[in-house]
C-alpha cells in the first residue's frame, strides 16, 4: 500500500492591520492543531509571518514566533527581519506549498487582498475567494445587499465621501444621525474587525468624538441604532453544501461587546444558546442564505442580534476569517458540534480541496 504524501500547509499570519496581534494568537492555535499527533501524519506546516512593515518573514523565524522563542513585539526590523525577509514573487519559499491557510484578520488580508495575491500561485486556499472576502469585510456593502434581500437588520445610516475635517460637515452629520436614529447608536468604520474603531454613543455630545475615531480607520462610516439584544453567533463550513454549527450566545460583562470584551474579559459563553428551536432554525437558515448571497464559502462566522423584548432576529455581520484564539467563538461552536480543533483544521483543508 502506497503511503499518501503529506500535504504542505502554508500558514500566513500577522499583517499590518490593527488586528496583527489577534492574527498571531489565531495562528498559534492553528499551528499547534496541525502539529498534533493525529494531524502530523497528514500535514506539514510552513509558516509565513508578515510583520507590521509588510515584510514576509521566512519559516524559521515565523515558527519561532509561533512557539514563543521570539517575541515579535520586541524584535526590531533592522536587527532580525532584514536578514530573514523573503520575496513572494521569487517563489522559492513557496514551491512546496500544497494549500494556503491565510489567517490575516482585518484589512490587507481578510478583505480579499491576500486571496488575490495567493491566486497567482495557482494553489488552493482555506476560506472563501476574493469577492466574498471583500463583501464580508465591508460593512456598508454587506448591509446594502442584505437590505435588498429584505433580511432583517437594525436601522442604520451610511456616511461616506464626507470631509470630517470640516466642522460644518460634522455638525450636519450629527443632526442627520439624531434625526434618523434613536440613541444609543454604534459608530463603526466600514472596514474593520474585532470591534476596533467602534464606539457606543448614548447622547449627542459624544457623537463627534465617535465619528472622528471611526474616520481614523476608514473614511466610510456606518452608524447603527442600538437595541436591547442578545449576541448570537453561528459557524459555517462547506462549499457546495454549507453546514451550520450549534448556535452560541455571548454574555459580556462590559457595557457592550468591544475589543476588550472579545479578547481580555471573562465572558459567559453558552453553546448551544438557550433559545427556541424555531428561532434556532431561522438563524441557521439566514446564516446559509447570507453566505450564499455574498459568495462566502470555506468557513465563516455569522453574527446576529436577538431582540430581548420581541425575540426578533437581526443579522449583524459575517466574519470570513473568524478568530481561532483561546477565547474565539468559532472553534468553540464547532467543538460543541462534534469537531475539536484538530479535526476542524483538517476538515477545513479537506473542504478547500473538495475531498
From Swiss-Prot:
Enzyme class: ligase
Top-level taxon of origin: Bacteria
Molecular function in Gene Ontology: ATP binding; D-alanine-D-alanine ligase activity; metal ion binding
Recorded metabolic or biological pathway in which this protein acts: Cell wall biogenesis; peptidoglycan biosynthesis
PROSITE patterns: ATP_GRASP, DALA_DALA_LIGASE_1, DALA_DALA_LIGASE_2
Catalytic activity line of the entry: 2 D-alanine + ATP = D-alanyl-D-alanine + ADP + phosphate + H(+)
Coiled coil regions in record: none
Domain ATP-grasp: 143-350
Residue intervals passing through the bilayer: none
Cofactor(s) demanded: Mg(2+); Mn(2+)
Amino acids binding ATP: 178-233
One GO term of the biological process aspect: regulation of cell shape
Keywords: ATP-binding, Cell shape, Cell wall biogenesis/degradation, Cytoplasm, Ligase, Magnesium, Manganese, Metal-binding, Nucleotide-binding, Peptidoglycan synthesis
GO cellular component, one term: cytosol
UniProt cofactor note: Binds 2 magnesium or manganese ions per subunit.
Binding annotation for Mg(2+) 1: 303, 317
Biological function: Cell wall formation.
Record-linked HAMAP family: Dala_Dala_lig
Protein name per the record: D-alanine--D-alanine ligase
Organism of origin: Prochlorococcus marinus (strain MIT 9312)
Amino acid at each position: 500500500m502506497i503511503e499518501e504524501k503529506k500535504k504542505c500547509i502554508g500558514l500566513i499570519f500577522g499583517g499590518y492591520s490593527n488586528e496583527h496581534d489577534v492574527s498571531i494568537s489565531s495562528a498559534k492555535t492553528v499551528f499547534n492543531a496541525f502539529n498534533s499527533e493525529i494531524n502530523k501524519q497528514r500535514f506539514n506546516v510552513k509558516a509565513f509571518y508578515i510583520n507590521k512593515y509588510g515584510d514576509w518573514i521566512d519559516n524559521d523565524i515565523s515558527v519561532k514566533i509561533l512557539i514563543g522563542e521570539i517575541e515579535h513585539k520586541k524584535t526590531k526590523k533592522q536587527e532580525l527581519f532584514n536578514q530573514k525577509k523573503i520575496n513572494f514573487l521569487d517563489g522559492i519559499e513557496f514551491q512546496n506549498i500544497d494549500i494556503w491557510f491565510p489567517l490575516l484578520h482585518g484589512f490587507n488580508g481578510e478583505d480579499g487582498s491576500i486571496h488575490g495575491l495567493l491566486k497567482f500561485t495557482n494553489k488552493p486556499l482555506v476560506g472563501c475567494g476574493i469577492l466574498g472576502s471583500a463583501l464580508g469585510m465591508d460593512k456598508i456593502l454587506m448591509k446594502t445587499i442584505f437590505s435588498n434581500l429584505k433580511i432583517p437588520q437594525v436601522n442604520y445610516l451610511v456616511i461616506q465621501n464626507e470631509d470630517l475635517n470640516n466642522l460644518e460637515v460634522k455638525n450636519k452629520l450629527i443632526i442627520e444621525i439624531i434625526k434618523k436614529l434613536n440613541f444609543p447608536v454604534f459608530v463603526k468604520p466600514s472596514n474593520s474587525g474585532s470591534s476596533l474603531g467602534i464606539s457606543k454613543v448614548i447622547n449627542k455630545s459624544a457623537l463627534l468624538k465617535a465619528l472622528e475615531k471611526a474616520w481614523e480607520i476608514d473614511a466610510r462610516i456606518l452608524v447603527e441604532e442600538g437595541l436591547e439584544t442578545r449576541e448570537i453567533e453561528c459557524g459555517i463550513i462547506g462549499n457546495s453544501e454549507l453546514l451550520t454549527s450549534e448556535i452560541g450566545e455571548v454574555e459580556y460583562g462590559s457595557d457592550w461587546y468591544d475589543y476588550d470584551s472579545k479578547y481580555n474579559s471573562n465572558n459567559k459563553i453558552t453553546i448551544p444558546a438557550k433559545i427556541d428551536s424555531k428561532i434556532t432554525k431561522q438563524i441557521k437558515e439566514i446564516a446559509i442564505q447570507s453566505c450564499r448571497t455574498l459568495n462566502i464559502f470555506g468557513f465563516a462566522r455569522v453574527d446576529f442580534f436577538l431582540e430581548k423584548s420581541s425575540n426578533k432576529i437581526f443579522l449583524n455581520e459575517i466574519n470570513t476569517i473568524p478568530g481561532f484564539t483561546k477565547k474565539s467563538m468559532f472553534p468553540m461552536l464547532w467543538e460543541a458540534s462534534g469537531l475539536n480543533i484538530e479535526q476542524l483544521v483538517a476538515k477545513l483543508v479537506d473542504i478547500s480541496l473538495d475531498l
